[in-house]
Amino acid sequence: MATNITWHPNLTYDERKALRKQDGCTIWLTGLSASGKSTIACALEQLLLQKNLSAYRLDGDNIRFGLNKDLGFSEKDRNENIRRISEVSKLFADSCAISITSFISPYRVDRDRARELHKEAGLKFIEIFVDVPLEVAEQRDPKGLYKKAREGVIKEFTGISAPYEAPKAPELHLRTDQKTVEECATIIYEYLISEKIIRKHL
């Protein structure tokens, strides 16, 4: 980090909270490709917006078109991908928005760092394991990525030729082969209410 820079203070979290009438947090959806992360994130964002709550979705694929377009899929690049997203999602949470991230984020240490980053800032971090058996994910395979990975066309593909480290103690564990997208979004919404991050909206 450069030594000739200065942190500039701005509005306090409490001032933003009073304006938005909600707490900020990061909802971190992690799981295999085709587990349903992005689909749940979209449904949750719509549900929150229907309740007049401020939310913003950060999607793994979309981010690689811009902020992280210089990164590949090596372990080092995956680490940097998640580090950047952790910082961005923290900024959204600090603005009292509900930041919804949907990234495979295969390494436990990266997710733990993201959690610690939020903890140091006094912000809530909600890790959600979007779980599905590998064989179900392969059957879904909407982008044909598992097929390409099995054929050796895609290298270092999570779940096939690269590891996925499942969360040990996530706030929520969703089995998407057993619950619908709408049920998963509702479970997360009700969790936010139970944790007093948001108030129940009729």
Swiss-Prot record:
Organism of derivation: Saccharomyces cerevisiae (strain ATCC 204508 / S288c) (Baker's yeast)
Active site: 105
Gene Ontology molecular function: any one: ATP binding
Miscellaneous section: Present with 2170 molecules/cell in log phase SD medium.
Gene name, Swiss-Prot/TrEMBL: MET14
GO cellular component, one term: cytoplasm
Presence of keyword Nucleotide-binding: yes
Annotated transmembrane regions: none
Protein name: Adenylyl-sulfate kinase
Residues annotated for ATP binding in this entry: 31-38
Pathway recorded for this protein: Sulfur metabolism; hydrogen sulfide biosynthesis; sulfite from sulfate: step 2/3
Keyword check for ATP-binding: yes
Annotated function: Catalyzes the synthesis of activated sulfate.
Biological process according to GO: cysteine biosynthetic process; hydrogen sulfide biosynthetic process; methionine biosynthetic process; sulfate assimilation; sulfate assimilation, phosphoadenylyl sulfate reduction by phosphoadenylyl-sulfate reductase (thioredoxin); sulfur amino acid metabolic process
Pfam families: APS_kinase
Annotated family: Belongs to the APS kinase family.
Catalytic activity field: adenosine 5'-phosphosulfate + ATP = 3'-phosphoadenylyl sulfate + ADP + H(+)
Top-level taxon in the UniProt lineage: Eukaryota
Keywords: Amino-acid biosynthesis, ATP-binding, Cysteine biosynthesis, Kinase, Methionine biosynthesis, Nucleotide-binding, Transferase
Top class in the EC scheme: transferase
